[in-house]
Regions:
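Intrinsically disordered, low-complexity N-terminal segments that are enriched in acidic
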Residues: 1-85
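Short, charged, solvent-exposed linker or helix-capping segments at domain edges/interfaces
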Residues: 27, 88-94, 212
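Hydrophobic/aromatic-rich core segments of domains that either
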Residues: 133, 165-247
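Glycine-rich loops and low-complexity Gly/Arg-rich segments
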Residues: 38-42, 52-53, 67-68, 102-105, ...
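Low-complexity, flexible helical/coil segments
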Residues: 48-55, 61-66, 110-119, 217-223, ...
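Secondary-structure boundary elements
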Residues: 81, 86, 90, 96-161, ...
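Short low-complexity stretches enriched in small and charged residues
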Residues: 29-38, 87-89, 154-160, 164-167, ...
Length: 271
């Protein structure tokens, strides 16, 4: 198990989007559970502050709601500094069953044969590593190559995608191979180009371990934002009413005193 004591992260997100009158938005951008030295959030339209309601969704994620927005350009600025290590993710009695099931972007039932070929007779972390290695070797990371409607099925056919596509295919193969799995959005120091990131957690030996077939950022310095079955549960922005157009996004994440070394065969928990 990787040890990350002493690692602190500074993260930030800036979103700009145009809305029509009456628009309502649900946002997932805030650090989920890790201790934070200082956290700020500013949301404005023009020179007016926008009221923000914070709640928790069914997965326990920190969700921010913007309701009945007037027409205009919304500017959101979020910053969290001195982000420490959260407690290890808890394992609930229902996790094993619920995280083997298909979900919107993970067509588990269609991948039973493929998963059997990839996993073979491996079990536990050996099976997890086999799936992650297969996805890493068989997909090309190509920014702009997929859309929000792409799923594990279309990614398997296209053999290319971005982090969400890697995560969906990885999680689907794990579930199809009998390993409970879920997706997790995160701030990822070291990621290039910098953006919100989507990785995967697998339930092995009664603990959630994080894996990432993109190999684009060290797992030990990632900061959890949201947890769910797939991107339908972890998307950073969901329009609840009205209409919006995202016109700008800027994400930043750094690890202090520096990025940890990554060993992709090592067991890591997202803290």
């Amino acid at each position: 198990m990787a040890h990350t004591e002493g690692v602190e992260r500074d993260v930030s997100a800036a979103l700009t989007f145009d809305v029509i009158d009456g628009t309502e938005v649900a946002l997932l951008f805030a650090v989920s559970a890790a201790p934070i030295e200082q956290e700020t959030l500013e949301v404005t339209i023009g020179d007016r502050d926008v009221p923000v309601e914070e709640t928790r969704d069914r997965f326990g994620n920190r969700m921010h709601l913007l309701k009945d927005l007037p027409e205009g350009t919304v500017r959101l600025r979020y910053k969290a500094t001195g982000v420490g290590q959260a407690e290890p993710p808890t394992v609930e009695p229902t996790d094993a069953a619920s995280h083997l099931r298909p979900s919107r972007y993970c067509e588990v039932d269609e991948f039973t044969k493929v998963a059997a070929e990839v996993v073979g007779d491996r079990t536990g972390m050996a099976a997890v590593h086999a799936v992650v290695a297969w996805v890493h070797q068989h997909l090309d990371y190509v920014p702009g190559s997929s859309t929000v409607t792409d799923s594990a099925r279309s990614t398997y056919v296209a053999r290319q995608g971005v982090c969400r596509d890697y995560a969906h295919l990885t999680s689907t193969l794990l579930r199809a191979g009998g390993i409970p799995s879920r997706c997790v959005s995160a701030y990822a120091p070291g990621l290039s180009p910098m953006d919100f990131h989507l990785a995967v957690e697998a339930l092995v030996d009664e603990q959630w371990v994080v894996v990432d077939a993109t190999h684009l950022a060290p797992r030990a310095s990632m900061v959890r934002i949201a947890t769910g079955q797939d991107a339908a549960d972890t998307a950073f922005m969901t329009t609840l009413a009205g209409r919006l157009k995202l016109t700008g996004i800027r994400v930043n994440a750094v690890a202090n005193p520096g990025l940890p070394e990554e060993n992709w065969e090592q067991t890591v928990q997202l803290r």
